[in-house]
Design a protein with these regions (language model features):
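Structural signature of nuclease core domains in nucleic-acid processing machines
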Residues: 1-296
Length: 296
């Protein structure tokens, strides 16, 4: 409200879905009464915060996603979860046997998540560039500043969970990843109607930030993805090798979203993707004749 509006992509999505709900939540700031309990929605928040803490601890210990050993990964996960829980809800998670079980569940989900994210990175050439990038203070970003009229301006704020990049000559290829605990699939119809703006806003901001931080380089979009944080069950058969089980897990943990339909970019994201194959790490597949599948 006012002549200079400051909103997040989520707020704009809420307004597009229901203007009255937007008014109640962001105008009147109505919210549910907080209770001393740990609900299912809190589980997603804790996992998200623990994953952010893991990224910080990884950097602090001067480790990389690619070089991280299983032992180092598990130790960092335990540390990150304990640090997150200590700061969450005045130790609410330590208040009952049920919540103690939830701590173990968070650690299990996070182990599966970090393992899958490692495999996705190892499949291609991209490297994580930045984590938890806030662009609310970037006043001069064209991607987050819009002149609505002579006197009115809209400034978007937000935080990108992760930006990956691959540099070749004078070009920086960029993909953004947003961690989700629900099953919000990217839907182009929802994008068209303004109900899913987050990934597009984040990708545009990431491209502009990369060019700003690397003068003389040109940033190109490679993809925008949701990663669903979960620990899925897979159908197995007696005698299945560990490699086959991991393949099924990766299929279930594949990112969802849009990838740029260019052979070079697809190959740089998944070097094993070729004619007649479906990627285990990105939403792309080739027909036997080498054309992109309609499922891509």
């Amino acid at each position: 409200y006012g002549k200079e509006l400051e909103n997040s992509a989520t707020e704009l999505e809420r307004f597009a879905a229901c203007a009255f709900a937007h008014f109640l939540q962001y105008g009147l700031k109505i919210e549910e009464r907080q209770e001393y309990e740990f609900r299912q929605a809190d589980l997603g928040n804790v996992i998200h915060q623990a994953l952010e803490q893991f990224s910080r601890n990884l950097k602090k210990n001067r480790l990389t996603w690619r070089s991280l050993t299983d032992q180092e990964r598990d130790q960092l996960i335990d540390t990150s979860v304990e640090e997150t829980i200590h700061d969450y809800g005045n130790t609410i998670l330590e208040s009952s046997a049920r919540n103690q079980y939830m701590i173990l569940r968070v650690k299990r989900i996070l182990r599966r998540t970090v393992w899958a994210l490692q495999q996705q990175l190892k499949a291609g050439k991209y490297e994580p560039s930045r984590f938890e990038i806030s662009f609310s203070m970037e006043e001069d970003l064209k991607a987050s500043n819009f002149q609505l009229s002579e006197d009115e301006r809209l400034r978007l704020r937000g935080r990108i969970d992760r930006v990956d990049r691959y540099e070749e000559d004078d070009t920086i290829y960029v993909k953004v990843i947003d961690y989700k605990s629900g099953n919000t699939a990217l839907d182009l119809t929802s994008v068209y109607h303004g109900l899913q703006l987050q990934l597009i806003v984040y990708l545009n901001a990431a491209l502009e930030l990369e060019e700003k931080n690397h003068p003389g380089k040109h940033a190109e979009p490679a993809g925008m993805f949701y990663y669903y944080v979960k620990d899925p069950l897979v159908d197995g058969k007696p005698g299945d090798e560990e490699e086959e089980i991991e393949r099924k897990l990766l299929e279930k943990l594949k990112v969802d979203g849009l990838v740029r339909a260019e052979e070079k970019i697809l190959k740089d994201l998944d070097r094993e993707l070729e004619a007649g194959k479906k990627s285990l790490v990105i939403p792309a597949a080739y027909n036997k004749n080498g054309s992109l599948s309609s499922r891509s």
